[in-house]
């Protein structure tokens, strides 16, 4: 029985690894950029419009967790006329758990990045909480690369899911000028006793005090009604802060009924794109 269970576990792990590796190459244009900030090579999946013209200007969407949900993004963008002039850039994770938590978790949220508390041996700041470095890679290396190889307009979106959603909120809070649209699907904003929620509220509050220099921003947040209570609580906290302080931010949020954590980002893609397109027109 033990041998059979071990074999079954091995097969299950092999299937998971295969699915991950199968998505480490895309059906689009794959490029590799050496990052001096991260001191590693980073692969990027690029979806160019079907009628791409080198001298034409295009909108830009950058999304984290580039290994995940790429097919859904492709199919939705193919159906929406407004997205025919958009370049989609997906940044895959190097290794699912380690570099994902390292790259996407904000530096002020280094504790308890799972729905169950980490044991002390796995709670080292070296393991996660370096979103500032990942953002520096996007700002200082990826965006300049894209701007030097493609003509881009001013419509730029950052999208993320779960830990990537907390990264979206972190980016919007610290360097809001990098993008004019932000999508946070099932954002894991509950980290460290809702630290991400609190920091986002602080950003909104400070922004509301001085509106003269604010650039136009739009934000779309979703969560599934069947997700973990911590996720739903964080979602409620974000909504509360937006209702109080949002002022000039164009935003909307949605609870997708009956959807769990892995299901919500699939449904959210079209919802977010429709919202963004309406907000800039």
Model-assigned labels for residue ranges:
Residues 17-281:
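Non-catalytic cap/lid and distal C-terminal segments of serine-dependent acyl enzymes
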Residues 2-16:
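Hydrophobic membrane-insertion alpha-helices, especially the h-region
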Residues 1-2, 257:
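Membrane-water interface of alpha-helical transmembrane segments
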């Amino acid at each position: 029985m033990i041998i059979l269970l071990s074999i079954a576990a091995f097969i299950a792990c092999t299937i998971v690894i295969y699915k991950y590796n199968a998505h480490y190459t895309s059906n689009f244009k794959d490029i590799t950029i050496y990052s001096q900030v991260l001191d590693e090579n980073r692969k990027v999946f690029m979806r160019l419009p079907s009628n791409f013209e080198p001298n034409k200007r295009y909108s830009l969407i950058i999304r984290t967790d580039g290994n995940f949900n790429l097919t859904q993004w492709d199919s939705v963008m193919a159906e929406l006329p407004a997205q025919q002039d958009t370049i989609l850039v997906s940044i895959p994770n190097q290794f699912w758990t380690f570099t994902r938590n390292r790259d996407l978790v904000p530096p002020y949220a280094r504790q308890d990045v799972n729905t169950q508390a980490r044991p002390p041996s796995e709670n080292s700041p070296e393991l996660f909480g370096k979103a500032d470095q990942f953002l520096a890679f996007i700002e200082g290396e990826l965006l300049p690369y894209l701007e030097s190889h493609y003509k881009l307009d001013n419509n730029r979106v950052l999208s993320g899911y779960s830990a990537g959603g907390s990264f979206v909120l972190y980016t919007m809070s610290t360097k809001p000028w990098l993008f004019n649209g932000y999508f946070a699907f099932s954002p894991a904003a509950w980290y460290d006793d809702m630290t991400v929620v609190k920091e986002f509220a602080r950003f909104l509050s400070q922004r509301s005090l001085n509106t003269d220099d604010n650039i136009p921003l739009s934000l779309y947040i979703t969560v599934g009604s069947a997700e973990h209570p911590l996720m739903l609580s964080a979602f409620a906290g974000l909504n509360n802060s937006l209702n109080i302080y949002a002022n000039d931010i164009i935003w909307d949020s949605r609870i997708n009924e009956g959807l769990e954590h892995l299901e919500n980002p699939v449904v959210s893609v079209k919802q977010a794109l429709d919202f963004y397109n309406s907000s800039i027109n």
